[in-house]
Amino acid sequence: MSTLGDKESIIFKEKSFGGEKWSLQNGSRYGNQAGALRSLKVGKFCKVNIWDKNGTMQTFLGGEYPDITDKLPNVDIVQAIDVQFKYSVDIRFKHNVQGRDPNDFKLTVIPYQLNGVEIVSGGDYSGVQIPELNPPDSEIVCQISIREIKWPGQVFANGSIYFKYTPSNNTVSYRKTEGWPTNCEIVQDDVSGFTITLKSI
């Protein structure tokens, strides 16, 4: 574990840490289309949630796991988070604004009483990490805002949305209210992943 960062996890294609490997920092995720992950190393301050294609979810704390195939034979999604959090809402952001580059805008998501996460349009998923709530299936409200990255940094959307973790099936869902900005849409991609799109400015 000496070469593994405290906030880093490494997933491997073969058992006993062999074959191709991928490094994950806390707040990131890996979507494995082939289902071919067989072992992993988890940093001291990390927690890794892994879903199998059959819906099974397993959490791994800091340590080495040379063979995960008995519990997760066909890995689907790998989510790396800080150890003090329970789950992550994985969000990617894009836009449909004509004449603008894919990465012209920035989405900020701020969960209630937590630090915000900034997500540039056109990129991969970023994790909005959520602690365990009481009760565990409580909703948490998140403030969202979208602005252009270039000067003058004009704001084009402001609003809020609710997310909820369901322990019985280890999935994250969302609920829109009147606070959701009308020029945006959100689509649920999988058990923890969502795409937010800025439709117009």
Swiss-Prot record:
The keyword Calcium applies. One of its GO terms (cellular component) is extracellular matrix. One of its GO terms (biological process) is calcium-dependent cell-cell adhesion via plasma membrane cell adhesion molecules. Keywords: Calcium, Cell adhesion, Cell membrane, Membrane. The keyword Cell membrane applies. It is found in: Cell membrane. Mediates calcium-dependent cell-cell adhesion during the early stage of development. This is Putative calcium-dependent cell adhesion molecule 2. It comes from Dictyostelium discoideum (Social amoeba). The gene is cad2.
